[in-house]
UniProtKB/Swiss-Prot annotation:
It comes from Saccharophagus degradans (strain 2-40 / ATCC 43961 / DSM 17024). One of its GO terms (molecular function) is ATP binding. The keyword Ligase applies. InterPro entries: Arginosuc_syn_C, Arginosuc_syn_N, Arginosuc_synth, Arginosuc_synth_CS, Arginosuc_synth_type_1_subfam, AS_cat/multimer_dom_body, Rossmann-like_a/b/a_fold. Keywords: Amino-acid biosynthesis, Arginine biosynthesis, ATP-binding, Cytoplasm, Ligase, Nucleotide-binding. HAMAP family: Arg_succ_synth_type1 (MF_00005). L-citrulline binds at Y91, S96, N127, R131, S183, S192, E268, Y280. It is found in: Cytoplasm. This is Argininosuccinate synthase. Pfam families: Arginosuc_syn_C, Arginosuc_synth. Belongs to the argininosuccinate synthase family. Type 1 subfamily. The gene is argG. Homotetramer.
């Protein structure tokens, strides 16, 4: 690849691992440019500060290490769950929802440092390249994006290690070191596993793969109950204790994981065209989704709830495919957020051997009317004779069709 002399400074999404450490040196050599590294703490459970020393050893002068955990949950995870979002009926979008925040921060740092370009370590086969770059172009249309995995001739871990040896790149790997058989990605919402034996969709994942949860079979024999308090669609307290968004998710991850909640094994349709198998642990998100639907069940108008449900698959697709910063996602978000005004109250859930069961819900904004819903004497609150006219009017079009000879059988 020829160098581009117009690029003087590049902001790299930097983990401190093998791939992105190689990318730092490759950018320096290929573009003869200055590299700014950006490392985000979004709850991946690893120390991010060591990335500073690694970047310094590679000659990086401008190093950003940002704690984005609260922003991630407050501005991305919670808004997503207000829509009860799942992709293809199962996936809670743990990886997808983290990418818009990283893209935004890359652009902010590019603006702050006067960088000409941004770079990432996503491969040319996956969805993340699309998510990062769609976000970047939406937020800064003229930005250059450098995706080394689409350009260089380093095609394996072995060639990366050879590159490190040749260029004296300090990494915490050796050729002899045993590598995890899985490609993993983690943040406060989930941890994902791909590759290895999972590339055979018939092979069951090994038990020692799972890191956030016990197996449902080994979970406690006694259930645990949680009381979750909602305000405008977001959880603000657990068992009466007010918490920040990130603390809510951290707490639910621990409590749910201890009971084997949130494991998922799916084959999903990637935006780039292929099918991919992944395993996920999303204990906190699984609890939030179940509880949020429960509080909406008593606080939302029926037609509002049904309309939200009809829009949700498209909203989920937007997030999965990388269109968080699109006008259509923002339009839907405005409608979704507007619906959450009355979504206040408490939900009681039971965690037991991999399951989340809603066992109670209450709200001062509840539309549930016991006097009308009762099977006992409703004291005239509901006139059952009214149902006859309701049924006949709704049957009218079908009766006319039958009278005109339309055959159904």
């Amino acid at each position: 690849m020829s160098t581009n002399s117009s690029i003087k400074k590049v902001v790299l999404a930097y983990s401190g691992g093998l791939d992105t450490s190689v990318i730092v040196k490759w950018l320096q050599e290929t573009y003869n440019c200055e590299v700014v590294t950006f490392t985000a703490d979004i709850g991946q459970g690893e120390e991010v500060e060591p990335a500073r020393a690694k970047a310094e050893a590679l000659g990086v002068k401008e190093i950003y290490i940002d704690d984005l955990r609260e922003e991630f949950v407050r501005d991305y995870v919670f808004p997503m769950f207000r829509a009860n979002t799942i992709y293809e009926g199962e996936y809670l979008l743990g990886t997808s929802i983290a990418r818009p925040l990283i893209a935004k921060r890359l652009i902010e740092i590019a603006n702050e440092t006067g960088a000409d370009a941004i770079s990432h370590g996503a491969t040319g086969k996956g969805n993340d390249q699309v998510r990062f770059e769609l976000g970047a172009y939406a937020l800064k249309p003229g930005i250059h994006v450098i995706a080394p995995w689409r350009d260089w001739d380093l095609t394996s871990r072995e060639t990366l290690m050879d590159y490190c040896a040749k260029h004296n790149i300090p990494v915490d790997y050796t050729k002899a070191k045993k590598k995890s058989p899985y490609s993993m990605d983690a943040n406060l919402l989930h941890i994902s596993y791909e590759g290895g034996i999972l590339e055979d969709p018939w092979a069951e994942a090994e038990e020692d793969m799972w890191r956030w949860s016990v197996s449902p079979e080994a979970a406690p024999d006694q259930p645990e109950y949680l009381e979750l308090t909602f305000k405008h669609g977001d959880i603000v307290a657990i068992d009466g204790v007010e918490m920040s968004p990130a603390t809510v998710l951290e707490t639910l991850n621990k409590r749910g994981g201890a009971h084997g909640v949130g494991r998922l094994d799916i084959v999903e349709n990637r935006y780039v065209g292929m099918k991919s198998r992944g395993c996920y642990e999303t204990p906190g998100g699984t609890i939030i989704l179940r509880a949020h639907r429960a509080i909406e069940s008593i606080t939302l108008d029926r037609e509002v709830a049904h309309l939200k449900d009809s829009l949700m698959p498209k909203y989920a697709e937007m997030i999965y495919n990388g269109y968080w910063w699109s006008p259509e996602r923002q339009m839907l978000q405005t409608a979704i957020d507007n619906s959450q005004g009355p979504v206040n109250g408490d939900v009681r859930v039971k965690l037991y051997k991999g399951s989340v069961t809603v066992v109670g819900r209450r709200s001062n904004d509840s539309l549930f009317d016991e006097k009308i819903a009762t099977f006992e004497d409703d004291a005239g609150a509901y006139n059952q004779k009214d149902a006859e006219g309701f049924i006949k009017l709704n049957a009218l079009r079908m009766r006319i069709a039958a009278q005109k000879g339309r055959k159904l059988l």
